[in-house]
A protein has these predicted regions:
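Short, solvent-exposed aromatic-acidic interface loops
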Residues: 94-99, 179-184, 233-238
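General beta-strand structural signal in soluble alpha/beta enzymes
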Residues: 122-126, 175, 254-258
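Short acidic-glycine loop/turn motifs at beta-strand connectors
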Residues: 82-85, 131-132, 166-172, 202, ...
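Conserved, well-ordered active-site substructure
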Residues: 136-157, 206-257, 262-298
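N-terminal intrinsically disordered, acidic low-complexity segments at the extreme N-terminus
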Residues: 1-9
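Conserved beta-alpha junction segments in alpha/beta enzyme cores
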Residues: 67, 76-78, 192-223
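Zymogen propeptides
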Residues: 12-15, 22-156
Length: 298
């Protein structure tokens, strides 16, 4: 009778339990590999690509530009809104009554949720904020805004350090180059959003208000005379480069909003001729949003 120890390892029979374990291990490994390939393929297929100026809603033109300058790299998603176009409406986050009752102003939300609920053509993150969140931020967490927000005539608070980009009831845009904004301006403003510095003024870069640190950026700019609004998100840019790029696009006055991990732009599924959905978005909920409603081309 053979001693099991004398039988070569290659001739020994594997136990049924061990064989099943190996088969299941192989199947699971294959399944995860296939799932990984699907995810990578989907992300490649759906990732934004450079796009020439394209009207996606009535009066709303989207452009995607790939930049490779020293202080501006990656994709720029730029939306120009003609405030003269029929059907254009603005959206700004209003203070939440329940949050106010608890000593806060807002509840954190994600951009896709706001886009769907408010029936927006596009949405971007707005002002800086603080929240009662711990290590992770979740939708529904209490939050306070840093800069002033005017939402349908409702003023969130007066931040003494905020410049104000604001709109009259007919959507004529202005940038108040005095902080805090005067009471008369706040009475006129139907919509408004505060910013901490103005790197673009009268079509030129203000170097004293701009820096060279690179990060994800969200910015807004206007041309009062032509009644135009630009909303832009940059994958990686300095505030100096942001101001220069917006000036090259024809904007006259503008500033940065919250950026970094807050940077978000989402387009509605009704956007014509371009890929919709999240162009830059990390699913981080934020406190306030700037949105646009517009008539569909479809």
């Amino acid at each position: 009778m053979f001693d099991l120890l004398t039988i070569p390892r290659s001739m020994r029979l594997a136990s049924p339990g061990r064989s099943r374990l190996r088969r299941w291990t192989f199947r699971l490994t294959s399944l995860f590999a296939i799932a990984g390939l699907v995810v990578v393929g989907y992300r490649w297929w759906t990732q934004p690509r450079p796009t020439p100026p394209t009207e996606i809603f009535r009066g709303v033109i989207y452009t995607c530009i790939e930049l490779s300058e020293p202080e501006c790299r990656g994709l720029l998603h730029l939306v120009k809104i003609d405030l003269n176009a029929p059907g254009i409406q603005l959206y700004m986050t209003r203070t939440d009554p329940e949050a106010v009752a608890h000593g806060y102003q807002y509840r954190l939300e994600t951009a896709p949720a706001v886009l769907e609920r408010e029936h927006l053509a596009l949405v971007v993150n707005a002002a800086y904020f603080t929240s009662d969140s711990g290590v992770l931020q979740w939708s529904g967490d209490w939050a306070r805004g840093v800069q002033t927000i005017v939402a349908d005539g409702q003023v969130s608070h007066i931040d003494p350090h905020s410049y104000l980009l604001w709109f009259e009831s007919d959507l004529t845009p202005h940038l108040e180059f005095e902080k805090p904004p005067k009471a008369a301006v706040l009475r006129q403003a139907r919509w408004g959003i505060g910013g901490g510095a103005v790197p673009l003024w009268k079509g030129k870069l203000r170097e004293a208000a701009a820096g060279h640190e690179m990060d994800r950026r969200t910015a807004v700019a206007i041309d009062t005379g032509r009644r135009l609004l630009w909303v832009a998100v940059f994958e990686n840019a300095s505030s100096t480069a942001v101001a220069q790029v917006l000036a090259e696009q024809g904007a006259k006055d503008g500033f940065l909003l919250d950026g970094g991990h807050s940077t978000t732009m989402v387009l509605s599924p009704q956007a014509a001729h371009v890929q919709s959905g999240s162009l830059i978005h990390e699913w981080r909920p934020v406190a306030t949003f700037l949105g646009i409603r517009a008539e569909s081309l479809q």
